[in-house]
Amino acid sequence: MNENYQPRKPFTPQQAKTIVEQLFIQAERLDDTALGQITRSLLSVDEIRPQTVHIVFDRAFAGALRHAFRKEPLKSTEQIISLPDILSIGPVESLHTDEGIKNRFCWLQEHLRGDIQEQENEFRCAVQDIKRIPPHLPIILWAGNNAAEQTGLRFATYLLSGRPNEISELNTTKAFESLYRTTKHSEEIHILRSSELSPEQLLELYAHYEPWKWNPARRIAIEQEGKSLMYDGSYLRTWQYDELWSSDEDRHDSFIMECARQLQSEYPGEYYNVLRLIGQVYGELEQYTGDTWIEYRVKELIRHGELASKGDLGDWRKYEIGVIEDHRTIPNIDRDGF
C-alpha cells in the first residue's frame, strides 16, 4: 500500500477562480516565464495538502515516523499528530475536559520528575490538533501492544466521536512480527513499544502492511472504551490478553522489590545508587510505565519502610537505596527527603 502517489483532487471553485485571475494578470504582462511558474505552483496546490493523518502516542516514535516520511511525496501528504504522554500512568479521568487535563498534570507534577509544564502544553496542542482534523481526511492510529499507546488510542478515538473520518489501526507489534518473524527466530522477535522500530522499518511497514480499517462496530466499541476511561479513577493501566485493564498503583511493587534484592546481593550490607534499580526494572518489566513512574514507586517503598535511602531524594543521581528485611540490615535509614 501507499507506494503509488495519489492523484490530485479537483480544484474548488475558489481555487479555479484564483488560477484564472492570476493567469490573466500574467498574460497581460506578456511574462511567459512568470506565467509558467505561476501555473506550476497553482497546479500543485492540492498536492501539498495532507492526504492522511497519523496519530501516534509516543514522542520518540513520532520523531522516527517523521524521519521515515521526510522525503516527498510522503513529506507533504502525511500529517503526524503526536500525543506525547505516557497514558498508562497517572489520572485520566475527564481527560477530555480542561479540568481533567489540569488534574492529570498537577498529579504528575506532584509525584514525578520532569518538565511537566512543557508536557502539558504539548498535550493540549495535540488534543486541539486532533479536534481540528478535516472531516474528509482518513486517520491511521499507530499503537503497539502496551497500555500507554492503547490508552492513547482509545482516548483519541473518543475525541473523534461523531466525526465522519475513516479510521484505521496499525498495530506496530503485530505488523513487525508479521513482516520480520521467521521460523528460526520465531521466539526472539518482539517489541514492547512502537519507538523500538527504526525509520527504515516504519517505512517498510507503511508500504507493505495493510492497516485494519475499522468497521462501525469496532469503532463504536473503542469509543465506548475511551468513554469508560474518562470515568476511570485508577492511576495505572496494564495491557493483558489484548485488553486494557485498570490496576492498583502497587501492582509492580513486588517485582521492584525482587529486583532490589537481586542487586542487594551484590552489595551486602551496603547502599547502591537508585538508578541501578530503576534501570533494571525498566529493562525487565513487561509493561511500559516510563522510568519516572518506577522511581515514584521506589519512593513509595521507601516511605513504607521496604527500602532504606540516604542522600538527596530530589535528584536520582544523588541518593542510594538498600533493602530492609528488618531495621538492622541497613543502617542510617533516611526518610527526610519526603
Spans of features found by a protein language model:
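Short acidic, hydrophobic short linear motifs in intrinsically disordered regions
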Residues: Y267-E284
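Short amphipathic alpha-helical interaction segments
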Residues: Q287-R303
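C-terminal engagement modules used by replication, chromatin/transcription, nuclear envelope/ESCRT
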Residues: E300-F338
